[in-house]
Regions:
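Transmembrane core module of solute transporters
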Residues: 1-82, 191-192
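Cytoplasmic loop-to-transmembrane helix junctions
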Residues: 82-89
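Hydrophobic transmembrane architecture of multi-pass small-molecule transporters
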Residues: 89, 94-187
Length: 192
């Protein structure tokens, strides 16, 4: 998809960045990931498909830029006889790390969505004076079961969006922390 197109562009950009210390390329990639995350955090329920696609391209570019220097730094100090085991461990740890972060993100989306649904439904009451003002309910009502179901559906959409924005915040924060970790990681190592 579009993230793959971005990844291809990111891999191509590593030819330009490859002359520098690999940590610089990784920092640039994670900075692009932070930019993508901040962009995601500003989406709302009216986000366009085009904005989502361009964000996927930016995420792909960032992963493409990160991947090559990360792989180079991982394997450049190893002797050839250890490469097969190191490659297996590298991919195992990458998969475990990805799975863990995806699980944490989904848990945050669900937790935050449920919490916000609960808080928003507390405000919906025939005794809430604000909701008694003319036009305050828009196209929603609280008199019949179908009206309440429609209102509940809208609250669910709004709460889910808040959950996703919080998940995107987690993604952005993790990328920003990665920049700091890259900056404080060791130098070029042997063979550089």
């Amino acid at each position: 998809g579009f993230r793959g197109i971005g990844g291809t562009i990111g891999f191509a950009l590593t030819f330009l960045i490859g002359r520098w210390d690999p940590r610089i390329g990784m920092a640039i990639g994670f900075a692009a990931m932070v930019a993508a995350g901040l962009w995601l955090m500003h989406f709302d329920l009216n986000v366009s498909e085009e904005a989502l696609l361009w964000n996927a391209v930016l995420q792909g570019i960032s992963v493409g830029i990160i991947w090559v220097p990360l792989t180079v730094l991982t394997f450049k100090t190893l002797d050839r006889e250890h490469l097969p085991e190191a490659m297996a461990m590298f991919h195992l740890l990458r998969n475990i790390g990805s799975s863990l972060f995806i699980s944490l993100s989904v848990a945050e989306i669900i937790r935050s969505g449920a919490m916000n649904y609960s808080r928003m439904t507390e405000m919906i009451s025939p005794y809430n004076r604000t909701l008694q003002l003319p036009g305050s309910m828009g196209g929603f009502g609280m008199e019949t079961v179908p009206e309440l179901a429609k209102l509940s559906g809208e609250i669910t959409r709004q709460a889910a969006m808040i959950g996703y924005v919080n998940g995107f915040g987690l993604f952005t924060a993790a990328s920003a922390v990665a920049i700091v970790l890259v900056a404080f990681s060791g130098g070029r190592g042997k063979g550089a």
